[in-house]
């Protein structure tokens, strides 16, 4: 296995500062690699943002490449309604066209993350027949059935993905992704994440949860997650406790804790993110308004003020009404 780490991000200009914080943390935490090449799928960044990211890479003597994605995304016949943020996320479907042909694997990382540990162990992971490796997500079985997958199969969070590029090229997964998007008339359940899960099917490796510690895992126990999301299986409580104590990648997903760059966030790793952001050229960026939708803010209030059993009852039944009755 090569000692070169290939990492990929995608972003528009709105998320460029948070990409910068994540990238800085990646480089700080992975000095053991002899070479790190970072590919930025550019969905509309300014020249100033690109220069800022180049400055961060240069601080660590690492390589960075920018790939304009507008023409690629234009191939997608998307009908997303109000979900405009999902458009840039679809860029990860084009990884085979972004990375060089001699690159057999890549670690895709969402911008809203902080890397706190070495990635050397998972980078050397043998794929076998698998197309992706990732962490099981906290979503209910509706999303599996909605994209035609067997109930009980671990649904992978696409925010952190180790991608078998060699197999993606050989089996032309891009064409399969586009086929799924057409099948759902441009509105796949869970967007790009649903598309990737639908195509990869059972050919996935489930990584330890410490490699993608999403916000829900700070709010709920393993038992509660299985109950409120109607999951047949999930990580154990010991798995969650160990990951929270020593995370490799913290993923600041939308949730009850808010996001660290927004006002009112109570995320336990909030200051770690803000410290990383402060060390980038965007260090003076003020906190942004809380962007969570009204319903999620209401659930946050109930979470903080209601008995836990009542909250779980409300949350579970909301999931049932939104998904399982469809």
What are these regions (language model features)?
Residues 66, 70-72, 88-140, 153-155, ...:
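GT-A fold catalytic core of metal-dependent nucleotide-sugar glycosyltransferases
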Residues 1-11, 170, 174-326:
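A glycosyltransferase accessory/donor-loop signature
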Residues 30-39, 64:
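Short loop->beta transition adjacent to catalytic acidic/histidine clusters or analogous donor-positioning motifs
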Residues 36-44, 134-135:
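Short internal beta-strands
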Residues 44-51, 142:
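Short, charged/polar "capping" segments at the starts of alpha-helices
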Residues 6-9, 26, 37-40:
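Hydrophobic targeting segments
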Residues 49, 55-97:
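Active-site-proximal specificity loops/subdomain of glycosyltransferases
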Residues 16-31:
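Histidine-anchored nucleotide/phosphate-binding helix
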């Amino acid at each position: 296995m090569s000692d070169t780490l290939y990492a990929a991000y995608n972003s528009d200009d709105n998320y460029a500062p948070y990409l910068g914080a994540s990238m800085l943390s990646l480089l700080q935490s992975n000095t053991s690699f002899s070479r790190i090449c970072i590919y930025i799928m550019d969905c509309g960044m300014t020249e100033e943002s690109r220069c800022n990211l180049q400055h961060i890479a240069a601080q660590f003597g690492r390589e960075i490449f920018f790939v304009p994605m507008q023409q690629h995304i234009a191939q997608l016949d998307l009908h997303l309604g109000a979900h405009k943020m999902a458009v840039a996320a679809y860029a990860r479907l084009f990884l085979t066209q972004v990375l060089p042909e001699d690159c057999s694997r890549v670690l895709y990382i969402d911008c809203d993350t902080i890397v706190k540990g070495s990635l050397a162990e998972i980078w050397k992971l043998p794929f076998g027949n698998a197309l992706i490796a990732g962490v099981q997500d906290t979503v209910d079985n509706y999303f599996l059935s909605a994209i035609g997958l067997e109930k009980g199969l671990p649904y992978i969070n696409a925010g952190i993905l180790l991608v078998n590029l060699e197999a993606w090229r050989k089996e032309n997964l891009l064409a399969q992704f586009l086929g799924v998007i057409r099948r759902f008339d441009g509105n796949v359940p869970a967007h790009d994440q649903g598309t990737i899960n639908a195509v990869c099917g059972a050919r996935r490796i489930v990584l330890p949860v410490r490699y993608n510690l999403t916000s829900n895992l700070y709010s709920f126990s393993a038992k509660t997650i299985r109950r409120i999301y109607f999951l047949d299986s999930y990580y154990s409580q010991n798995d969650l406790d160990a990951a929270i104590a020593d995370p490799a990648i913290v993923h600041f997903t939308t949730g009850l804790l808010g996001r660290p760059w927004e006002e009112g966030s109570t995320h336990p790793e909030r200051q770690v993110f803000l410290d990383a952001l402060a060390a980038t050229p965007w260090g003076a960026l003020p906190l942004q308004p809380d962007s969570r939708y009204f319903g999620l803010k209401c659930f946050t209030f109930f979470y903080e003020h209601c008995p836990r059993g009542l909250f779980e009852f409300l949350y579970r039944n909301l999931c049932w009404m939104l998904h399982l009755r469809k």
